[in-house]
Amino acid sequence: MFKGKLMTVTLILMAVLALGIVGCGPAEEPTATVGDIVGIDPGAGIMAATEEALEVYDLEVGLIEGSDAAMTAELSTAIANEEWVIVTGWAPHWKFAEWDLKFLEDPELVYGGEEYIASVSRLDLVDDYPDVHEFLQNFYWDDAEIGAVMDMNAEEPEFLANAQTWIEDNRDLVDGWIPEGLEGDGETIEILMVEWDCATASTYVVSAILQEAGYEVEVTAVDAGVMWSSIAEGDADFFTTAWLPGTHEAYMDEFGDDVDEVGTNYEGAQIGLVVPAYVGFDSIAEINDYAD
């Protein structure tokens, strides 16, 4: 009888222990999810490419229109809360220095490969201001150089003052861009730009150099379509941020015969979908696995 009671107690203890093991075992971590892709202004080429990506990859998320500032604010909030988020992104951009980010792989090459950034002018700028045209041909910088200006602008949005400071710190490089005859006499140069951080950096550096040379400079921010059409119609002089051959391909197709692609000022640019490095997938093709 004692033996029988002992066996019963033993079985009860084993059952309790089994329940305890199950109850105290590590709970399965919930899978993080992603919501809609956070985009920028609807006229941007990257937004058209992202609309195409939604179709090509049959994505079960949407695309939110906004602005560069709204996109980076959303990214900042998500990272502060260690949340997963997908944004439209491009490099060069100061956010890559601020946070640990990664481009999602694009196996269908919707966003294309590497791009370059070019300065584009009205056709007769070379006749009216040949030295300004030559300066734009010479203007070229690398990731560290444009990144330094973008970092300054992100910390304190005094764009012209930051450009002037950067110029003083990089005088040898800048002097190599300036042709011997670059000397204005109060003539007005009109520069257009889109409100992208890389465009702000290059536009104000070029503007500051031309002001040093004696020109009056007017900078106007517009959307990409207006920027291209205005230069094609001769309503302004130039802009420094044509992303080619992909992002601004449609504009080049439409206006290419009526503008002058003066020269490349940056190589190795990239566009695509960007996530914090801690996000647990690496490809656009995997987004649906984590869509909420």
What are these model-predicted stretches?
Residues 29-38, 122, 141, 257-292:
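A conserved helix-loop-strand patch within extracytoplasmic ligand-binding domains
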Residues 20-23:
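C-terminal motif of bacterial Sec signal peptides marking the signal peptidase cleavage site
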Residues 77-102, 240-255:
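A ligand-binding cleft/hinge motif common to bilobed small-molecule-binding domains
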Residues 25-27:
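Bacterial signal peptide processing site
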Residues 30-39, 136, 185-198, 215-220, ...:
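Short, well-ordered beta-strand elements
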Residues 52-53, 69-84, 204-212, 225-239:
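Short helices/loops that flank or line small-molecule/ion binding pockets
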Residues 63-74, 194-197, 218-230:
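Short helix-initiation/N-cap motifs at beta->coil->alpha
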Residues 69, 92-142, 263-272:
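Periplasmic-binding protein-like
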